[in-house]
């Protein structure tokens, strides 16, 4: 994770749509961080902070993001973040692959014709020690595509 943070710190990325980028980065040791460019500072410094989850808002300013509404430059999706955190708290004794899928399902969104960002297009559960990923497209939870990095193999 630290290596990825250092790599990103050498870039200044700005989304032309008026929103900025943020990334959730983890490694096999369990180090997970949200990495984002500070939207309140003119110099937009890169900030990396330990967090267990993130949705469509700046983690740096999560205290300024209220659920079920737009929150200006800070983003939206607090209710989905809260749903993920509830799953993680309920299963705090030990996360499993089922924990990941429970959290992804809890935070998924059905399409909403008046809100372009309200459609979960894909969900991915990464296994950083097994070097695998399970992918679900458009909330078809029973149709899992599996990928193995070590085997460079895709299965359905």
Would you name each region that the model predicts?
Residues 1-13:
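Compact, glycine/acidic-enriched structural inserts
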Residues 18-21, 26-156:
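C-terminal, well-structured catalytic/ligand-binding subdomain of enzymes
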């Amino acid at each position: 994770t630290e290596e990825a943070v250092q790599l990103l710190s050498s870039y200044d990325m700005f989304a032309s749509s008026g929103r900025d980028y943020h990334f959730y980065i983890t490694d096999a040791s369990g180090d997970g961080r949200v990495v984002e460019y500070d939207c309140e500072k003119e110099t937009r410094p890169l900030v990396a902070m330990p967090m267990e989850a993130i949705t469509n808002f700046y983690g740096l300013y999560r205290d300024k993001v209220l659920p079920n509404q737009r929150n200006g430059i800070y983003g939206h999706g607090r209710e989905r973040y809260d749903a993920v955190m509830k799953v993680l708290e309920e299963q705090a004794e030990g996360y499993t692959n089922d924990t990941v899928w429970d959290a992804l399902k809890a935070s998924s969104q059905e399409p909403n014709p008046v809100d372009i960002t309200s459609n979960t297009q894909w969900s991915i559960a990464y296994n950083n020690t097994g070097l695998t990923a399970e992918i679900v497209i458009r909330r078809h939870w029973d149709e899992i595509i599996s990928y193995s990095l070590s085997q460079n193999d895709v299965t359905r």
